[in-house]
Amino acid sequence: MEHDFSTSKIVEFMIRTKNLTFGYRSRRKVLNDITLELGEGHIHGLLGCNGIGKTTLLKLICGIMRPSSGEVRVDGIDPMTRQPQMFSELMIIPEEFDLPNLSLERYAAMMKPFYPRFDHGSMRRYAEELKVNTEDKLHNMSMGQRKKAYIAFALACNVRTLLMDEPTNGLDIPSKSIFRRLLASYVDEERMVVISTHQVADVESLLDNIVILDNEGVALAATTTEICNKLKFGRAEENDSVLYKETTIAGEMAVMENRAGEDTQLNIELLFNAVTADRKAINNLFNR
């Protein structure tokens, strides 16, 4: 039965899309028939090949772009209606962005009226941990420093939905570690984070829900627990049901059906390659 957004009661804060499609007149569809539910209390990983539409999906969720067809709702609200109560609970950190020629302190003073739960003390603490001087002009910072400054501000806004597009690009190794720690402590049962990334290793330990997009739409959407219940990762034994395998520096690694319910360490990169190689086989297993 199809889901009717206009009449259903939303019982928890959630991003929902239904048959969401976006394309330019002169180009193929960038997104095709995306139906998703992303709930609070999770860090969602949004994965896909270059040009598959991950950034576009984030922009549609924010109302920066208008869908060609289909629907998107954030806590039951259409982003295109520009309702203040939705935008006060939603923030995006783009991969690339321009900030005014102000210090982080002055930028925060200018923007905090839009975010009722903004906490100035938290921003200063995050900035200090990320080694950002809140009095330095943003224009004078390197790309990595600007990104860390914006991350500090975004976390201090305490929004319920935080969207991040390649958040670790430009961060050095110590900053990535600090970023992971701050983000892990940010999410609670009333907040969600959606991370679009190619740098899976930077955030793999944070993700508890995985969404993989391909040219046909949503290739896979599952929690990490569901994935590890269905699949196992590692070296294949003689009787294993192998769905995908590849040669790595560590030897031949495989994605296999987890028939015996064994404990397994999720390998998101291997999972992504398996879904890309044979979407149908993975889908058939998850749909049983």
What are these language model-derived features?
Residues F5-D33, E40:
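A short, flexible loop at the N-terminus of ABC-type nucleotide-binding domains that lies
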Residues C62:
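Helix-to-loop junction immediately C-terminal to a conserved catalytic motif
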Residues Q85, I92-A149:
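ABC-family P-loop ATPase nucleotide-binding domains
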Residues L47-C49:
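The feature captures the beta-strand-to-loop junction immediately N-terminal to the Walker
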Residues I178-V194, H198-M256:
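ABC transporter nucleotide-binding domain
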